[in-house]
Amino acid sequence: MASEILVDHRQKALALLKLDADKILKLIQVQMDNLTMPQCPLYEEVLDTQMFGLSREIDFAVRLGLVDQHEGKKLLDKLERELSALHDAFTKK
């Protein structure tokens, strides 16, 4: 039973981290849709703050043993790739 609870907590932790990553993507997409320049200081500040916050959440979950370090890095890498793709798409408009 204890191992089932641990697995459940791990699944919940990863699901919450993925939800936070999705929120960042949506926020950035909205900003990019409404800004004329992706190098806007506000855009960069929001991106930096949100990415830093998510990285700290992931680090905390890893330290608690709820998320594998590789899985956390994979989540951040995926988000960074998607944000880069959004930026590239915006600059090619």
UniProtKB/Swiss-Prot annotation:
Transmembrane segments: none annotated. InterPro entries: UPF0358, UPF0358_sf. It comes from Bacillus pumilus (strain SAFR-032). This is UPF0358 protein BPUM_1375. Belongs to the UPF0358 family.
